[in-house]
Amino acid sequence: MTQTLSQLEHSEAFIERHIGSSAQQQQQLLEAVGARSLNALIQQIVPADIQLPAPPPVGDAATEHQALAELKAIASQNQRYKSYIGMGYSAVLTPPVILRNMLENPGWYTAYTPYQPEVSQGRLEALLNFQTVTLDLTGLDLASASLLDEATAAAEAMALAKRASKLKDANRFFVADDVHPQTLDVVRTRAATFGFEVIVDKAEKVLELQGVFGVLLQQVGTTGELHDYSALLAELKNRKIGTSVAADIMALVLLTAPGKQGADVVFGSAQRFGVPMGYGGPHAAFFACRDEFKRSMPGRIIGVSRDAAGNTALRMAMQTREQHIRREKANSNICTSQVLLANIASLYAVYHGPQGLQRIAGRIHRLTDILAAGLQQAGLQLRHKTWFDTLTVEVKDKAAVLERALSFGINLRTDIHGAVGITLDEATSREDVQTLFALLAGDNHGLDIDALDAAVSKNSQSIPAGMLRKDPILTHPVFNSYHSETEMMRYMHRLERKDLALNQAMIPLGSCTMKLNAAAEMIPITWPEFSELHPFCPPEQAAGYKQMIGQLSQWLVQLTGYDAVCMQPNSGAQGEYAGLLAIRHYHESRNESGRHICLIPSSAHGTNPASAQMAGMSVVVVACDKNGNIDLHDLRVKAEQAGEELSCIMVTYPSTHGVYEETIREVCQIVHQFGGQVYLDGANMNAQVGITTPGYIGADVSHLNLHKTFCIPHGGGGPGMGPIGVKAHLAPFVPGHSVVQIDGVLTQQGAVSAAPFGSASILPISWMYIRMMGAEGLKQASQVAILNANYIATRLKDAYPVLYTGRDHRVAHECILDIRPLKEETGISEMDIAKRLIDYGFHAPTMSFPVAGTLMVEPTESESKVELDRFIDAMLAIRSEIDRVAKGEWPLEDNPLVNAPHIQAELVSDWQHAYSRELAVFPIAGVRENKYWPSVKRLDDVYGDRNLFCSCVPMSEYE
């Protein structure tokens, strides 16, 4: 054997696992596109003046086991204290059946947002269950399928209140003084960009004020007190002031629904329903409102509709409210929500059912009552007379109490003047309460749990009788049927089978980068060292997180060419918002607050104008030329017209048209010449990493979609992470946090997310990816992604024109197939092709974005030549089918394209089509061996929006 030990150790092994095609297959792909090597292909495609002389120095590759061992050593530096801090975060007991069959299951976590409902019925049903839980617990009419976190939901509630307000001159938003501080922080950030005045005071003080358009209350208050807001809500309604209540989802199991008390909007975090704290996230927020506000509601709504055969089917309803259609006029900027986390919470409710939830909530409340009674018996005073799970305990020597708590391995809430806060949770046991007695009342406290239980069970008044829930919850059969693990496992598998995820086939969605989410990358997110930490624990207890985040940040600095990275934004859209706020605050620091114009090319993703609007900027559209590139003349004219009002440009690179624009540096120079900043959208970073960087190109700030480029899975529509990279002059202006000090950030910068580091517990995924790939592997990933896109474009260009190409007729990492000529000639649309692909076993490419009547294909580096060929064969076969329609062999109203997708039930019913059953479901030979069967036919979108219904339907509807 002539190999060296170094070669046998094979530290680059993961690169071959991540990149789908072998070296031999890559050579075949290169021959097909007419390039000698990967480097030669890149030289043909990427402008020479932006190519890096060497890959960014992020180190060599490591094997999966080496990287896991390194990260485990880092994670072990985190100290797992018992955290009773509360403030919207609680320890949970995730049911193992959900952990194994959903959170650790690629059939759930690798799926995309359910824009194609025919291949998404399983997770749509789980999300509908989530909405039903929300409606039952809040007492309102309409619920969304999750928002990013509770604080973001509060900001959205404020925006809704203003949109819906009939008090057009009112400009003040009132926040009760017992709302969580991080929620207030995010509300203030959003209010500042909209020019709203935020007033914080005791709830009843709002009645003394004028010019208020909305009010935010909290149930349970941040220090534990319960409030009967019925009278206040009624009076505010009389005054036409919008009302929102931030609610604890577990408390709502026992308490009267705020909607029944008169609230217009109720929202909160669903974290307590089975999702670990994870040092701040990811967690799904729930959001509900009255029916009259449905057109103003933020976020996605799952609605009950019907398919082409008249059968009940689910879809995302009223999508015309979303930013990809309405752009800067959108209700919200919901590009990534928290589907995976919402579905965990949904299935937690299904598994426990109403009785199980009442038992859990009842146990938490009983233990809190016992703790309260014991502390009072020991001579300690409580600040409030009512509570669900949180006590504020008056202490004389607070510092001594907190020091003693740490010696017990316990974290208490520290920021209440003259007192400590204690929040109990699902994981709290009677032994934990005994430990708290010893901590606060001394080792010889003499308190007996059973005796205290007997006393409080008879005469507890901590929840006033008038605030106890009287109505039943979760009466639908889905919440009363799956309580054995066997039934629950089968229910989850039944849902999973309805969906198409990466474990079934390539998902070639343009602008989405659906690459491999490797098992080794996913393993650390469930380690208790990462999953159990409270986001507001003492920083020394999170030393492992600090090291991991620090290393990841430094790698991202190298890979982007920026000087600093902020990890707080918990979605790409939030990253855009945070980056634009940094630009805004930078201009303000230079006494140039008049710079408010944001230039955006006409090809931009809808999140760009929506983010600009959220950041308080005015959007001016820059034209593109016939080749899809930014029109430099128009850019120069618009920049000059804006003059001292020019704030920035938002540009995507490679462009949203799938091309490396040759003039990108000139674009940056023009904007800088007129005093603006350059925001380079990181959506297409998978075509930059290792080849160029935004900083090298000339940009000032970018967000990175870690759920695209850096392997965090899409989760069926979230979680995501959108950290921003910035040049040094913008670094002081990235988001801060009112509870946790973030190094290097000016303290006056507000937060954009509830937790200081966003969805911190999924950052290990990106850490693992970069560590295992190394500098050369990351560059190779970008090169192969570009190669794969050019292979598809080359093979399909004669059947489907490629709309935009760059030098030498090359594309970047994605290509746009123009269906418009075919539609004009034959009547077959991009929608028909997308739905027919389901019969061939594929998720559709991105439809009608960024150009109507097109399909945008992004294959990613993780797909093998075998899978690329399978997709190409499907597209060519579909083109042959279109030709048969054009020749008149099949009528336009009855052919396998317009009738797609086809379901099993059709095969055993009367068949009266002009084509065979076999052609319908097994159109080419390769489909037979791994057939995906959709559970519904094509959805009736018009019916779904005209008949909006967004909670569970009777089980008979599915029969």
From Swiss-Prot:
Pfam families: GcvP2_C, GDC-P. GO terms for biological process: glycine decarboxylation via glycine cleavage system. The gene is gcvP. PANTHER family: GLYCINE DEHYDROGENASE (DECARBOXYLATING) (PTHR11773:SF13), GLYCINE DEHYDROGENASE, DECARBOXYLATING (PTHR11773). This is Glycine dehydrogenase (decarboxylating). Its EC number is 1.4.4.2. The modification N6-(pyridoxal phosphate)lysine is found at K708. CDD domains: GDC-P (cd00613). It comes from Serratia proteamaculans (strain 568). Transmembrane segments: none annotated. The keyword Transferase does not apply. The glycine cleavage system catalyzes the degradation of glycine. The P protein binds the alpha-amino group of glycine through its pyridoxal phosphate cofactor; CO(2) is released and the remaining methylamine moiety is then transferred to the lipoamide cofactor of the H protein. The glycine cleavage system is composed of four proteins: P, T, L and H.
